Amino acid sequence: MNLIHFGAGNIGCGFIAPILSSIVDHIYFVDNNIDIVNKINTQKLIKIHTSDSKKISITNISAWLLTDFINYKKTWNEVSLLTISIGIKNLKHIIYYVNQLIDYKIKNNQKLIIMCCENGIRVSSLFKSYFSNLNNNIYFVDVLVDRIVSNKNILNDYLECEDYYLWIVDKTQLPSDFKQVPNLTYTTSFDIQITKKIYMLNALHCSLAWFVFKNFSFNKYLYVYQALKNDKVVEFVNNYLNEVILVLNHKYNINLDELNNYKNQIIKRLNSNFIKDDLKRLARNTELKLSKNERILTILDYAKDNNLKHDILLLSYQNGLEYLKNNK
């Protein structure tokens, strides 16, 4: 099995490639950056250094310029998986090219699985809505992905990423005869997994940034791991996650052991100084994050309506409002 991946940036090379390179025979990257395409085709090598001191070399790769995509039809027979990491707002720019691949697969009665590995909710399903020429051989499968990859220039000698990664697949959207790809996690309760990540990890990120800004300022703590050396910050993180866990257990009946294990995993990642996670970055888009039906108010409102402990959730919302007021 071969793989086509749209996006030869840090996520494509630092996340997708090291996870799938040992599973597929070959990875064809597609990108519109000629320097990256030339580097991959010349060196035939991607080097990865992980937070656990692992060094990974990926050699079963080549790259195509986006505008040359149609010229490589001769390789498409062996491609059964298409993955994408170009940013949700850029998906519209590859519709034409993906459509050509879909038409080819339908014409030749071949299966194709498409996974949008983007930071969003059910992005593959969203991408599917852009196409009308589909049949039962084309599968858009939603995934939940998470891995911190350094913002090092992809043209450097190597990329850095944390050893941890999350790649959860909605099993219900796969063909019944699909042979599961190793290194991925398959679930029939995909929405529950999304819920955990949004309200425990994503919401904590911005809440932590607002808390540090209010109590210490970003001049004292620039990165997450630095702030986690302060006992007051550690206490906030623990109390925040404990209140979220109460809500998720009450609302979705998610097992407490599962939630607490995820909490411990989050805290371990926050404490790592291998990848420097910028607090200012985590505080971005505050107005959106404070809006109704978003990561903060959804949990806070449920806790209040059901008489669950919510002191820290409320504090976080107030911190966010203060940050917004000072950073318009």
Swiss-Prot record:
Keywords: NAD, Oxidoreductase. Gene3D superfamilies: N-(1-d-carboxylethyl)-l-norvaline Dehydrogenase, domain 2, NAD(P)-binding Rossmann-like Domain. NAD(+) binds at residues 3-14. GO terms for biological process: mannitol catabolic process. GO terms for cellular component: cytosol. One of its GO terms (molecular function) is mannitol-1-phosphate 5-dehydrogenase activity. It comes from the Bacteria. InterPro entries: 6-PGluconate_DH-like_C_sf (IPR008927), 6PGD_dom2 (IPR013328), Mannitol_DH_C (IPR013118), Mannitol_DH_CS (IPR023027), Mannitol_DH_N (IPR013131), NAD(P)-bd_dom_sf (IPR036291). Its EC number is 1.1.1.17. It catalyses: D-mannitol 1-phosphate + NAD(+) = beta-D-fructose 6-phosphate + NADH + H(+). Belongs to the mannitol dehydrogenase family. This is Mannitol-1-phosphate 5-dehydrogenase. It comes from Mycoplasma mycoides subsp. mycoides SC (strain CCUG 32753 / NCTC 10114 / PG1).
